Amino acid sequence: MQTHEIRKRFLDHFVKAGHTEVPSASVILDDPNLLFVNAGMVQFVPFFLGQCTPPYATATSIQKCIRTPDIDDVGITTRHNTFFQMAGNFSFGDYFKRGAIELAWALLTNSFADGGYGLDPERLWATVYLDDDEAAGLWQEIAGLPPERIQRRGMADNYWSMGIPGPCGPSSEIYYDRGPEFGPEGGPIVNEDRYLEVWNLVFMQNERGEGTTKEDYEIRGPLPRKNIDTGMGVERIALVLQGVHNVYEIDLLRPVIDLVATRAPRPYDPENEDTNHADNVRYRIIADHSRTAAILIGDGVSPVNDGRGYVLRRLLRRIIRSAKLLGIDSPIVGDLMATVCNAMGRAYPGLVTDFDRINRIAVAEETAFNRTLTSGSKLFDDVVGATVASGSTVVAGLDAFTLHDTYGFPIELTLEMAAEAGLTVDEKGFHELMLQQRQRAKVDAAARKQAHVDLTAYRELVDAGPTEFTGFDELTTEARILGIFVEGKRVPVVAHAVRGQAGITNRVELVLDRTPLYAESGGQIADAGTISGIGAGASSRAAVTDVQKIAKTLHVHRVNLESGEFVEGDTVVAVVDPGWRRGAAQGHSGTHIVHAALRQVLGPNAVQAGSLNRPGYLRFDFNWQGSLTGEQRTQIEEVTNEAVQADFEVHTFTEKLDTAKAMGAIALFGEAYPDEVRVVEMGGPFSLELCGGTHVHNTAQIGPVTILGESSIGSGVRRVEAYVGLDSFRHLAKERALMAGLASSLQVPSEEVHARVATLVERLKAAEKELERARQANVQAAATKAAAGAEWIGNVRVVVQRMSGPIAPDDLRFLVGDIRGKLGSDPAVVALIAVTSDGPTATVPYAVAANPAAQDLGIRANDLVEQLAMVVDGRGGGKADLAQGSGKDPTGIDAALDTVRAQIAQVG
């Protein structure tokens, strides 16, 4: 039974039983805690937790899933896959254990004619959680399983969760007995190669908390209602129904192995696993990883150096290296992507329609990694040789670090290659060096930001507690000075006079207990404003030029003292420049709107990679492969400005992190968030993000948004830049004035400028071609004329001339070679000299050519060029047959030509 038929029968079975068919979600979700969708129930989590009401009581789906913790085991065993399809049925407070067992048993054992898989009931086993007597009894009642074919297991095996806080519950697994050729009797607890798990029924009834293992986590309590979540691995059941030994031989994976076999000099030979294990593993790695890579790229992931993109990069690199170890030296990734997309295109049509993009991204990574392998492999071989020669079996951490830092070798690749050489790697030493490098980078960044301040000077204030930020509610705040710092040293008082003192750089910082001034973070630059004294200190004033956070909690105000003095403990007034804040809020809110527009136009996989917001300007970086089309840029700008025009209300509120994510709030992948987060909402579902920045009250306050351009800033990362508000208007006004000027100069209406310029460009190109033809004709004519005027100096035919009119050095070089060819086989020398222009900026290009017969006489073109150079204050070089140079003194041209003649006369 082909896989597409297996999928169809599964969905049909549950649709007939009243379930709603739900399409597979992307393997990427807006959840920073979840690298990839790793289970069929992930898209239904809010329903299980009771956070929202499902639109159906029961559902069925076949979900794309990716699991990468066991990536190093892929291929070594035949049970691990990084990508798989999870067929599932779900009940949200409808049926529970009885219904789940009845439906699963019917599909597995019903005949082909009745829409089932026709499995022999005598070969099916079940496992249940240790104390789940109810499930054990139902298996006996419904399926007629004898007690000896119902085995009990603990939390590690039969209590399911996603591995992170969320729904959980006891499970019951269904196993298929493949027969004695696969191992001894005794059921799943004895041998899971013989007894293959095909279906897992999870009785979702509790909510779990944090934990580090499958058994070590808190059960928070019951869910609002009892639910069912089941998962049947499509590849697993295909293995059984297609009668093959492992998943790599089913109809979805075997075509990839067959392709590789046509390119590799060594075969895939699972019948001789003991003697051919290493090559078989490489075949299986390529087959598995090719599918996963195609799915990831199809769902919008690009190969980069962190997060999901790094997983993709690692998969592609393992494919490429495995192919090389099989003896495949030519590019293969493009063919692999074509084979995978063809095999899986029926289930996932996007792999076919989006093939060009998928292929382009994968092949680009292959090209780049081949360069990495070429440059780093020699060093690795040297490292292995030195390690073995020293009698050690451990590659030094420093060597692994050098491979990573200099040649881009990921540590996983070094570990893999070392293992193949019978060595291990000092991973602890490697990670210590990586940590030191990261710490150096942080220190460098902090030093650049803090102008090399000793950050420990702030420790007492940091320990005292965070600065209270009042800037969301007010722009003016009365505060107390907690600390004053000059040149990184804490002082009790600072006065305006320090500006004039020798050796003082006027770097003054104030730390207050409260402030309305926003500290740079989240891509938004710091507020500008003032800090002033009150009462007796009213004459004291400082302009705030920057605000930075120390230890993420302490606001440090960098100021320029303008008058008076500040004393620790004084009360002051901190004021935000309202125009600056307004502009910064426009930029930050504009960034949210542009982000939402990007996701609407490009899809949810246009994931934020960074941003910068300042008054009137925004910059947004996002993961995307390839440049945007003109149409996409126009759409993004249009959607953005439509949102501005819609005058959406901007709401901010705090919420529990889990609740905010369940609402659909976008969080940055890899970012650490507290339990309570601030959510910024614009237009309801249009834009919902976790954000701690300042914003406008409604989107109309952003003003027009003009996208300036889009560019690449690294592999798989694009950047959009835009003006907002008044700056956007000014930019548009400038462009309008420019267009009006062009229209006036071209004497056409503005709307015809583009066509008119295109016509002029074509005319210019045609004229340039005509000029080039004329120039070449003139050069040919000059060559013919010069050859006709050749003179004899002794036995040598010579053309030694000053060319009339300016002539380019390249033309001069062509001329001497062409003339030399016209002078026949007798000894011949051609020396031409010219002047590029009149006046003090003139240069004197020259070129000399000597044919083989002249060289036999000892005449060398490069020697003659050296003689020319000395006379016209120049330099040059070349070979015996052709040389050229350039001088600065046109007055020496005649003398230079005489010098050439004299040199030839001495030989000829």
From Swiss-Prot:
The keyword Aminoacyl-tRNA synthetase belongs to this UniProt entry's keyword annotation: yes
CC annotations in GO: cytosol
Documented EC number(s): 6.1.1.7
Cofactor: Zn(2+)
SMART domains assigned: tRNA_SAD (SM00863)
Statement: the UniProt record of this protein carries the keyword tRNA-binding: yes
Ranges in coiled-coil conformation: none
Catalytic activity reported: tRNA(Ala) + L-alanine + ATP = L-alanyl-tRNA(Ala) + AMP + diphosphate
Chief location: cytoplasm
Function field: Catalyzes the attachment of alanine to tRNA(Ala) in a two-step reaction: alanine is first activated by ATP to form Ala-AMP and then transferred to the acceptor end of tRNA(Ala). Also edits incorrectly charged Ser-tRNA(Ala) and Gly-tRNA(Ala) via its editing domain.
Protein name listed in UniProt: Alanine--tRNA ligase
Organism of origin: Mycobacterium leprae (strain TN)
Lineage of source species: Bacteria, Bacillati, Actinomycetota, Actinomycetes, Mycobacteriales
